[in-house]
């Protein structure tokens, strides 16, 4: 092989590596090539901004709150980030092409997947709400396993991250579900990053740690079970309602940023409260999800779960930008979420 051919092959390999590098989030360290000092880049990372996308999506006033980052430095950082991350208009055809790359993670039930048009969508927030024993946590356990499957089997070929606010996560359930899909149980457990959240501030701080982990390895799924449980205990009474909703809105915005930056499927469970009015005397109490309009607007897809006969559960699509309102029946067994056996 001639020297010219060797150089041509090296250039081709380099170009391929560059294309692979540019696919996905940019590490925040790439801002150094745009003239940002390494000490300032470290301050950004310490503040939880691990990607250039994360910097570009962050409001200017939040960047100013980072210790040691002056007004002039913020302008320079924002300018450098905007050159690497396109934030302007794009055509609908380009957006349509990008949407074709979105992955759906199977729920474990073919009937439920049919209603969801493939499964749980990556790059967005899916909310599961319902009363206790409606199947929310069991669906989350199943997704922790199915997200590790190959894409041609309905998986996401990535790891799962589980933030547990209620103490209901059980690793042995993952082992049972892994057997069903023919996966090695030890590998499945190793690929699930688990954290217990103890208060709302801790729950928010865990998202900063999540971002630093996602930049290092591929995660396909982030679960918060439940997103609202700690808000019901940390904030009490109408006097703290405004503070609770502001804190919740910021937490949900951080979840959406992770979905945008890393393309993970974000699944949150939500508790419900009985809505007692005059009609409840005749039709029984109606349940509504916690969080009000802030939760409703922050989630992309909203699914309501309720109990059926025995182990049967019903999932209803409440709101979605692309899914019609529909219902699906599924069953909870030792193997996780499965189709009903009529």
From Swiss-Prot:
GO cellular component terms, semicolon-separated: chromosome; nucleus
Signal peptide: none
Expression induction: By genotoxic stress and by DNA damage (gamma-radiation, UV-B). Regulated by ATM in response to DNA double strand breaks (DSBs).
One GO BP annotation of this record: response to radiation
Region (Disordered): 1-24
Quaternary structure note: Self-associates and interacts with XRCC3. Binds to RAD54/CHR25. Interacts with BRCA2A and BRCA2B. Can form a tripartite complex with both BRCA2B and DSS1(I).
Summary of the function given for this chain in its UniProt record: Binds to single and double-stranded DNA and exhibits DNA-dependent ATPase activity. Unwinds duplex DNA. Component of the meiotic recombination pathway. Seems to play a role in mediating chromosome homology search, chromosome pairing and synapsis at early stages and probably chromosome crossing-over at later stages in meiosis. Probably is involved in the repair of meiotic double strand breaks (DBSs) generated by AtSPO11-1 and in homologous recombination. Its function is dispensable for vegetative growth and root mitosis.
Protein name: DNA repair protein RAD51 homolog 1
Taxonomic lineage of the native organism: Eukaryota, Viridiplantae, Streptophyta, Embryophyta, Tracheophyta
Primary gene name: RAD51
């Amino acid at each position: 092989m001639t020297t010219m051919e060797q150089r041509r092959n090296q250039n081709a390999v380099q170009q391929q590596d560059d294309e692979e590098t540019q696919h996905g989030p940019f590490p925040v360290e790439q801002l150094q090539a745009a003239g940002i000092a390494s000490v300032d880049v470290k301050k950004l990372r310490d503040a939880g901004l691990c990607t250039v996308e994360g910097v570009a999506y962050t409001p200017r006033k939040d960047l100013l709150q980072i210790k040691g980052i002056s007004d002039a430095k913020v302008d320079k950082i924002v300018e450098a980030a905007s050159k690497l991350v396109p934030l302007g208009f794009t055509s609908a055809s380009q957006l349509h092409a990008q949407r074709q790359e979105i992955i759906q993670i199977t729920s474990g039930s073919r009937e439920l997947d049919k209603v969801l048009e493939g499964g749980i969508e990556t790059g967005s927030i899916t909310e599961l709400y319902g009363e206790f024993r409606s199947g929310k946590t069991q669906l989350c356990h199943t997704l922790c396993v199915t997200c590790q499957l190959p894409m041609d089997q309905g998986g996401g070929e990535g790891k799962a991250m589980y933030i547990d606010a209620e103490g209901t996560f059980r690793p042995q359930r993952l082992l049972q579900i892994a057997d069903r899909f023919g996966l090695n149980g030890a590998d499945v457990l190793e690929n699930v990053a688990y954290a217990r959240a103890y208060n709302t501030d801790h729950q928010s701080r865990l998202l900063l740690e999540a971002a630093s982990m996602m930049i290092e390895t591929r995660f396909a799924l982030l679960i918060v079970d439940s997103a609202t449980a700690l808000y019901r205990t940390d904030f009490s009474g109408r006097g703290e309602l405004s503070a609770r909703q502001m804190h919740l809105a910021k937490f949900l915005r951080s979840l959406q940023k992770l979905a945008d930056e890393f393309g993970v499927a974000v699944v949150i469970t939500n508790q419900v409260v009985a809505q007692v009015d005059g009609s409840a005397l005749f039709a029984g109490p109606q349940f509504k999800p916690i969080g009000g309009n802030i939760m409703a607007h922050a989630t992309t897809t909203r699914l309501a779960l309720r109990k059926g006969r025995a182990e049967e559960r019903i999932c209803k699509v409440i709101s979605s930008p692309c899914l019609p309102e529909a219902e699906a029946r599924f069953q909870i067994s030792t193997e996780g979420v499965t189709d009903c056996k009529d």
